[in-house]
């Protein structure tokens, strides 16, 4: 008994490492993703990219729904928050592959992206599905624009989809599904996803967060101007972004109905900041 108690004491003593790992990876990945998105995709200035990345990362960390489930509960958070952070690292690498003119940077990011995509595909279904959807869309975009980077993107996408497929077909899923009962079906899961997406956006836009977005609007407008991008169908694009955003909730609603754990709610909340940033910049482009 003494030996077992001693082992538990040692384990608890080192448990403090968990939030350090989870918070550090989240902060770094969130900042790098926002910075790279603005700097490379929208051609924003370095100062604006750093400022927006810092503000959004701080807000996402500060106003997390349930910090205990995202950063302090290792067993739950490592499978959700940590994998979400890996997804952001992957998207940062993919943007670099598409937009960077530095061959070495593109090669390094390509090498890093392949194992990352395979690993994420085998993680929680929300992040795995969302990642695969984004990768498919980016690959299609590159094919349409006849960019040679579509080849490596296609490889990364296939790795993500194969990993997700293996995860879905794993025998343990049937056992787990039997223990929670039958889900509501595909149609209801989609309805729940769209409803929760709207609720999540409204609930996440608290007064301080709304003030933050208003304060960032002039910055987003300048970024939109510097990007040189133009879009002809703003309403359709925002609806499309919203559909992709809502897809995160579909796996859990399909499997468990309307019961969503906080750790799942947290990663959808984190994605809210990326969705709002892209949408607000896009809306700024309408008048240019």
Explain the meaning of each model-derived region.
Residues 1-6, 10, 286-287:
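Single conserved hydrophobic/aromatic residue that forms the stacking wall/gate
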Residues 21-47, 51, 89:
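Transmembrane-helix motifs of polytopic, lipid-linked glycan transferases
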Residues 29-33, 206-232:
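Hydrophobic, aromatic-rich transmembrane alpha-helices
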Residues 48-95, 124, 246-281:
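Membrane-interface micro-motifs in multi-pass membrane enzymes
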Residues 52-59, 153-160, 228-254:
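Transmembrane alpha-helix segments characteristic
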Residues 96-118, 148, 154-155:
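Short hydrophobic alpha-helices at membrane interfaces in multi-pass membrane enzymes
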Residues 107-136:
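Membrane-interface alpha helices of multi-pass inner-membrane proteins
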Residues 130-160:
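Perimembrane helix-loop-helix junctions
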């Amino acid at each position: 008994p003494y030996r077992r108690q001693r082992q538990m004491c040692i384990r608890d003593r080192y448990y403090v490492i968990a939030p350090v790992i989870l918070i550090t990876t989240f902060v770094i990945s969130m900042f790098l993703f926002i910075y790279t998105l603005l700097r490379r995709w929208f051609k924003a200035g370095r100062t604006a990219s750093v400022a927006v990345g810092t503000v959004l990362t701080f807000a996402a960390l500060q106003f997390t729904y349930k910090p205990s489930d995202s950063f302090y509960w290792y067993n739950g958070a490592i499978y959700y928050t940590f994998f979400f952070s890996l997804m952001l690292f992957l998207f940062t690498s993919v943007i670099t592959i598409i937009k960077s003119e530095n061959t070495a940077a593109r090669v390094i990011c390509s090498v890093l992206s392949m194992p990352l995509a395979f690993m994420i595909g085998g993680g929680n279904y929300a992040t795995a599905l969302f990642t695969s959807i984004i990768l498919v869309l980016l690959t299609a975009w590159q094919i349409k624009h006849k960019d040679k980077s579509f080849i490596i993107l296609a490889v990364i996408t296939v790795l993500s989809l194969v990993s997700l497929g293996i995860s879905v077909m794993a025998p343990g899923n049937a056992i787990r599904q039997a223990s929670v009962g039958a889900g509501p079906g595909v149609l209801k899961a989609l309805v729940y996803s769209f409803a929760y997406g709207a609720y999540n956006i409204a609930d996440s836009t608290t007064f301080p967060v709304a003030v933050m977005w208003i304060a960032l609007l002039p910055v987003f407008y300048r970024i939109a101007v510097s990007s040189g991008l133009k879009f002809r169908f703003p309403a359709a694009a925002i609806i499309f972004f919203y559909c992709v955003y809502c897809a995160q909730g579909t796996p859990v609603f399909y499997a468990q109905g309307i019961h969503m754990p906080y750790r799942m709610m947290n990663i959808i909340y984190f994605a809210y900041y990326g969705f709002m940033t892209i949408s607000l910049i896009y809306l700024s482009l309408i008048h240019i």
